[in-house]
Regions:
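Conserved substrate/cofactor phosphate-moiety recognition/catalytic segment
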Residues: 23-64
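Small-molecule kinase domains that catalyze NTP-dependent phosphoryl transfer to phosphate-bearing small molecules
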Residues: 84, 91-132
Length: 132
């Protein structure tokens, strides 16, 4: 778990669910890590199970390096990699993403702080910001 005086916020869901839009609104003045940007920075485009696990660990490590609040935005298909985040926002706005392999491996969360089912989510962003 992150330091008690900082929140690590995970925005996760299928491709096309609105993760990046939500995360950018939330992270206006916060450190923000987008999956595609991080993959580009590390030149790591491995989407196998092992590649996705490596990316999940990398995203959490980057968020923790800030020693402050941070927002992380990525698919995070495996439930086990979501537990370390303080706030978990599931973008459950679509039933299927663009990629069949991702749809098949994506595990519904055992727990999330917020479940976003439509694009009227400004109240959720405000609620999270109040905690910071």
């Amino acid at each position: 778990m992150a330091q008690s005086n900082s929140y690590k916020i995970l925005v996760f869901g299928l491709p096309g669910s609105g993760k990046t839009t939500f995360a950018k609104k939330l992270a206006k003045d916060l450190p923000y890590f987008n999956n595609d940007d991080v993959r580009r920075m590390f030149n790591d485009w491995d989407f196998s199970m092992h590649g996705r696990i490596r990316q999940a660990e990398r995203m959490y490590c980057l968020a923790n390096m800030t020693h402050d609040h941070a927002v992380v935005d990525f698919i995070c298909p495996y439930d086990q990699h979501r537990h370390d985040y303080d706030v978990k926002v599931w973008m459950n706005t679509i039933k299927e993403g663009r990629y069949n392999d991702t749809n098949q491996m994506f595990e519904k969360p055992s727990h999330c702080t917020f479940e976003v089912k439509d694009y009227k989510y400004d109240h959720i962003i405000e609620e999270i910001k109040k905690k910071l």
